[in-house]
């Protein structure tokens, strides 16, 4: 009887542990507070992983949850990352820039590398989690140890938000998404300097002096749905996270078309 009682107690303890833990595997860590534009230079702690090809830009289509394509090419050049909830911020963190460094592993150089947020991750392994492209993760290493550091898998790192910098002359670019028409306009914004991310996009068409707010559709794509057909050219007014504004006057021409790219003559500098 004593043996049976002990067995019952053991089974009960196991069941209680399973209920308390919810599931097997590492415990889920709640996300930290949202990262803002407080450029105070303070380093915070995070965990870093990597995905995609060892020397690639992360996502297999060289894109990601921000909707930006060809992030393997300049000016992103594959130095990209998925941010977790307080970094990605449901798309409003798209385009923001961070310095990341590692110091604990012998392979770490200790020197910061700058990454652009172009994708998201929801893996609850730390309050702040960067899932870096293979190229960016390898760049944390001392010379010649890029492949070796990628074998670390998960790594403790330090990070801080920094102002985004682009090559001289790089202006803000708008991409009209496929499937758009005069009653539905979806616009991707990229190559935004300074804060890097946008909290408000407004549009002004030829028929009105009014600035109409667009809705954040997903990632870095903003949209306008209207019963009354829009008529170009369109001007776009952008507001960055720190409250700065720029106006791209008549950046989208009257004869605009879906899946077309239009380069403005403005930038946040």
UniProtKB/Swiss-Prot annotation:
Membrane topology note: Peripheral membrane protein
Residues of the signal peptide: 1-24
InterPro entries for the chain: Expan_Lol_pI, Expansin/allergen_DPBB_dom, Expansin_CBD, Expansin_CBD_sf, LolPI, RlpA-like_DPBB, RlpA-like_sf
Keyword annotations from UniProtKB, A to Z: Allergen, Cell wall, Cell wall biogenesis/degradation, Disulfide bond, Glycoprotein, Membrane, Secreted, Signal
Subcellular location, record wording: Secreted, Cell wall; Membrane
Location (main, coarse): secreted
Note: Beta-expansin 1 extension activity grass cell wall is enhanced by dithiothreitol (DTT) and EDTA, inhibited by Cu(2+) and Hg(2+), and resistant to denaturation by methanol boiling and heat treatments.
Keyword Signal: yes
Entries under PANTHER family matching the protein: EXPANSIN-B3, EXPANSIN-B9
Function: May aid fertilization by loosening the cell wall of the stigma and style, thereby facilitating penetration of the pollen tube. Acts selectively on grass cell walls, which are relatively poor in pectins and xyloglucans and rich in glucuronoarabinoxylans and (1-3),(1-4)-beta-D-glucans, when compared with cell walls of other angiosperms, including other monocots.
Name by which UniProt lists this protein: Expansin-B1
Top-level lineage group: Eukaryota
Residues of this chain annotated as glycosylated in UniProt: 34
Residue ranges occupied by any Expansin-like EG45 domain in the UniProt entry: 63-169
Domain Expansin-like CBD: 183-264
Disulfide bridge partners, by residue number: 66-94, 97-164, 102-108
UniProt GO cellular component terms: extracellular region; membrane
Gene Ontology biological-process annotations: plant-type cell wall loosening; plant-type cell wall organization or biogenesis; sexual reproduction
Sequence similarity: Belongs to the expansin family. Expansin B subfamily.
Tissue expression per record: Expressed in anthers and pollen.
